[in-house]
């Protein structure tokens, strides 16, 4: 072994290819290539183009620090993208692909532009950007002027990674490609995301979200008038959707009520009706992550078959669903966790961003005719050759009649004759999931001599509705026992040291870490990231808990006060003895900084060794989108805490 995957290397040497889109003729793939700029302390991204015929790659953009969201025009002659090349603004640009030429700016906004979609005739592009009715002209704040007093009358007045919103909401706009003339199409009181054109260009189907994305419906926008019609119940959800070839139907994934599950539905425009197609979909269509990753939209193969990207048991797969027969077939799966989904007009080639235990930040191409999948980039091959990733194995644990999937990462130079410290990594959610992905936290720990075990206890996503619902009103119950059973199975192995066990998790994983150290003294060290520590205070301060908490915890605080207390780590923190590091972003609106502050005080007064690392400006998603220096600092603290306390 010649090198380690240190925090610095994982942050500053990793190059990530993302958001790949294949040209309509299937001959080229455009993607955004990103990396961390140490001096500027920010991520940068430029557009690159891969030629399938010759295998050559070339850089397309050079101006600006972040060029993203590349989207092909229907005829393949242009690529639209979003750029920060105009200081203080977000610009929508188009770049010619078949002849040399400069990118041309179509329009700009002070707020971020996103969710581009070309009209079928290639003359117009739909997009979204935030609109503040109190600042319709998007005027910058005056220098030296005191911040305005913030007054709100709505519950969803803030959102993680966006901050204070009040009445600011994302709206749908269109811009004429030839003239650059733009038009604000919607003025809705709620956010509209990811508009998709109907085949005849008369409608845009978008996701309209309420309560910061907890509930969502389809919004049908009449392009001529801007009139918006909402489809489905207010308390339902929509994750992905796609127009049928005739423009008469829309397939969508989601649910008609808050159940923690996802099914497939078919909406008919002519009858304005919804038909349920499945009752417990065994896989989870890739709906992205709010404000961070877009959904992987399905594609109709013909009048009845739909191809989509979904996750099953932590593994990416391509699935074909027949809307007439309700037959579901997995066409392809690999031991990876991919992001995005782009297909050519012939429906042969699928391009995705790729991550696995052995690679990260690459673009993968799947040939539906041959069944072959291959990486077309090798951005991080030299890094992983010098600093090999962890070895791994998958195993299962049976507990109380339920099978729990689990994985174990081992140092690349693993020696079965040695004894290693063990760290249990708990995912977020609670309906998140672990899977076949390259995880910087896990890989950094394994590279520094730790066994890392992680699992999908009951409540995890990607196993269907019933499995996900097992955690409702039972946080810290059966899910905790599942995790302890998985850890027990690993600690029975001769190379795992039961006297050197640690636990770490972020978000719901932070909840479980805080919960565990109040239930047992088996852990000799803990790292608790962005915890949910006290359910009652979380309910009134989180951007989503006032609605989401009712489903998860059994009601409002006054309706379920005993349950809130029984499932709060704060109730048991006085019993904790585990040395604990708490890490949290100070601008976290999902699990607010007050949760970490309460935990710090409770552990300090319990006599624990405790340290609190706070990241100014850090949102809940800071480990993904935060400044490189903060992400590197976090990884150093994670590895350092366990090294100091587990040896």
What do the predicted segments below correspond to?
Residues 33-46, 61-67, 80-93, 102, ...:
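A flexible loop/linker signature enriched in serine peptidases of the S9 family
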Residues 24-25, 74-75, 120-121, 199-200, ...:
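Residue-level detector of Asp-centered blade-edge/turn motifs that repeat once per structural unit
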Residues 183, 275-294, 379-390:
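Surface-exposed loop and turn segments in beta-propeller and other repeat-based domains
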Residues 457-647:
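Active-site-proximal cap/loop segments of hydrolase catalytic domains
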Residues 51-55, 96-100, 176-180, 222-226, ...:
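Short loop/turn segments that connect beta-strands within beta-propeller blades
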Residues 377-499, 504-506, 538-547:
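Cap/lid segment of the alpha/beta-hydrolase catalytic domain
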Residues 19-21, 126-128, 135, 149-152, ...:
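Non-catalytic accessory segments flanking enzyme active sites
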Residues 29, 76-79, 125-126, 201-204, ...:
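Hydrophobic beta-strand positions that form the internal "hydrophobic ladder"
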């Amino acid at each position: 072994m010649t090198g380690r995957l240190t925090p610095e290397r994982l942050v500053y040497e990793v190059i990530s290819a993302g958001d790949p889109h294949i040209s309509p003729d299937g001959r080229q793939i455009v993607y955004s290539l990103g990396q961390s700029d140490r001096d500027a302390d920010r991520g940068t991204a430029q557009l690159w183009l891969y030629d399938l015929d010759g295998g050559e790659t070339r850089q397309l953009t050079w101006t600006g620090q972040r060029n993203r969201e590349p989207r092909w025009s229907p005829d393949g002659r242009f690529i639209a993208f979003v750029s920060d090349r105009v200081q203080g603004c977000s610009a929508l640009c188009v770049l010619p692909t078949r002849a040399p030429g400069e990118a041309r700016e179509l329009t700009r906004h002070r707020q971020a532009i996103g969710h581009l979609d070309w009209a079928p005739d290639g003359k117009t592009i739909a997009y979204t950007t935030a609109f503040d009715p109190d600042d319709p002209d998007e005027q910058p704040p005056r220098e030296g002027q005191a911040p305005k007093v913030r007054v709100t009358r709505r519950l969803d007045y803030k959102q993680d990674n966006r901050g204070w919103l009040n009445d600011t909401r994302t709206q749908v706009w269109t811009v004429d490609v030839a003239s650059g003339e733009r038009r604000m199409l919607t003025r809705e009181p709620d956010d509209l995301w990811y508009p998709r054109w109907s085949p005849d260009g008369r409608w845009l189907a978008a996701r309209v979200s309420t309560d910061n994305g907890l509930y969502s419906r389809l919004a049908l926008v009449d392009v001529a008038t801007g009139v918006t019609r909402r489809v489905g119940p207010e308390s339902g959800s929509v994750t992905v959707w796609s127009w049928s070839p005739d423009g008469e139907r829309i397939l969508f994934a989601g649910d008609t009520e808050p159940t923690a599950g996802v099914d497939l539905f078919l909406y008919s425009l002519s009858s304005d009706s919804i038909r349920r197609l499945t009752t417990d979909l065994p896989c989870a269509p890739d709906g992205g992550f709010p404000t961070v990753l877009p959904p992987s939209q399905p594609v109709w193969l013909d009048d009845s078959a739909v191809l989509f990207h979904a996750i099953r048991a932590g593994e990416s797969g391509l699935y074909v669903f027949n809307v007439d027969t309700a037959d579901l077939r997995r066409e392809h799966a690999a031991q990876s966790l991919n992001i995005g989904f782009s297909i050519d007009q012939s429906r042969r080639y699928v391009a995705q961003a790729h991550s696995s235990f052995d690679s990260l930040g690459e673009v993968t191409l799947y040939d539906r005719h041959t069944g072959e999948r291959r990486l077309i980039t090798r951005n991080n091959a030299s890094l992983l050759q010098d600093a090999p990733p962890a070895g791994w194995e998958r195993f299962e644990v049976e507990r109380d009649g339920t099978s729990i999937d689990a994985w174990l990462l081992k140092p690349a130079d693993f020696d079965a004759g040695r004894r290693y410290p063990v760290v249990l990594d708990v995912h977020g959610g609670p309906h998140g999931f672990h899977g076949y992905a390259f995880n910087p936290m896990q890989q950094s720990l394994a590279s520094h001599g730790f066994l890392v075990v992680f699992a999908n206890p009951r409540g995890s996503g990607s196993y269907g509705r019933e499995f996900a619902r097992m955690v409702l009103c039972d946080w810290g119950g059966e899910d905790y026992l599942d995790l302890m059973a998985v850890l027990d199975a690993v600690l029975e192995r001769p190379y795992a040291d039961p006297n050197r066990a640690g636990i770490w998790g972020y978000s719901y994983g932070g909840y479980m870490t805080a919960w565990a150290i109040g239930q047992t003294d088996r852990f000799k060290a803990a790292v608790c990231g962005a915890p949910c520590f006290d359910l009652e205070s979380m309910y009134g301060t989180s951007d989503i808990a006032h609605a989401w908490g009712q489903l998860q915890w059994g009601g409002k605080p006054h309706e379920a006060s005993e349950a809130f207390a029984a499932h709060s780590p704060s109730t048991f923190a006085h019993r904790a003895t585990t040395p604990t590091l708490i890490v949290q972003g100070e601008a976290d609106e999902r699990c607010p900084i007050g949760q970490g502050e309460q935990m710090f005080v409770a552990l300090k007064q319990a006599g624990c060794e405790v340290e609190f690392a706070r990241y100014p400006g850090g949102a809940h998603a800071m480990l993904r989108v935060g400044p490189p220096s903060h992400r590197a600092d976090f990884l150093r603290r994670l590895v350092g805490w366990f090294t100091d306390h587990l040896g």
